Amino acid sequence: MGCRTFWQMTQPIESYVGRCVSQSIAGSGVSPKSVNYIVFSTMDNNLRHLDVNFARNILEELGLVNCVPVFVSMQQCASSLAALNYARGLFLDPNVNHVLVVAFDFVVEDADRIQPFALFGDAVTSCMMVRGAETGLSLLSYGVNMDFAGLLGRDNFESRKRLVLTTQDGALKESSTHLDDVEMCFSTNFYKPISLFNAGVSGIKRNRLCVETLNTRAHCGNCDWMLNLMHYQECVGLTRGKKYLVQAFAPGFFACGLLESC
């Protein structure tokens, strides 16, 4: 089915989040005191497993003393793209210069890892959004929609296809992008046959689909698109001026965004 191994967290989630975010801060060269917001995202069912002082503990550990925490959820594995878009909107405030975006997902009971559509692994991903950055990626557009029948597990091929195409066409139009202009698509790590099926539904050619971390990490919820993007960036590299599509599939939801390398 395309996945050989998965990663499992053996320590409290805060330790993994702190380590990942610390690396993003160090890699950006931004002082922790200069970060204005940190936007977290995870799947709905993980919210009840977080410590009541989760955000406070992360802020204290990393020295984010001027940073406002925000949590985005309720869109399952599509929540991280909602968080990315929310973070983009924060820059409408001229006083905001640095925003951290963090996605994490984990499975509490191992028996829940194997699902009909994916094998679940644990992961944390994060990135720093910087006003006026001369290098990196820029979010050009974003789209999300919900299929209520899918949320109830009663959707069908036609309703899923309609959900994907309506959302994706809107995001492409907003960024004045044709699908043929997309260099690569970073998508959700469902079982490989399902990932290929989803790519076909959304018009993505097989050689333009990147779900490479499926093999070693399985499906890590909200982290998949960023894990695949990072893998591609490390192994192949992003081309300045090229556009990249990111996708997030979830029961009843589909979200996507257009990124441009600068």
Question: What would you call each of these model-derived segments?
Answer:
Residues M1-Y37, F148-E183, P193-R206, N228-Y232, ...:
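Conserved active-site "lid/cap" helical segment
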Residues P32-N46, I58:
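Membrane helical hairpin/interfacial module
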Residues V35, V96-N97, V182, G241:
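Short, high-confidence coil segments that cap the C-terminus of an alpha-helix
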Residues L92-F117, V124, G252-F254:
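Phosphate-binding/catalytic loop of phosphoryl-transfer enzymes
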Residues L47, V52, V65, S73-L92, ...:
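Claisen-condensing/thiolase-fold acyl-transfer catalytic domains that form or cleave C-C bonds
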Residues S41, V99-D105, M129, V246-F249:
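Short beta-strand segments
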Residues M1-I13, A111-G170, F249, L258-C262:
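Condensing-enzyme catalytic core mediating Claisen C-C bond formation in acyl metabolism
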Residues C3-M9, M43-D44, P69-S73, D112-I114, ...:
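A short glycine/serine-rich beta->alpha loop
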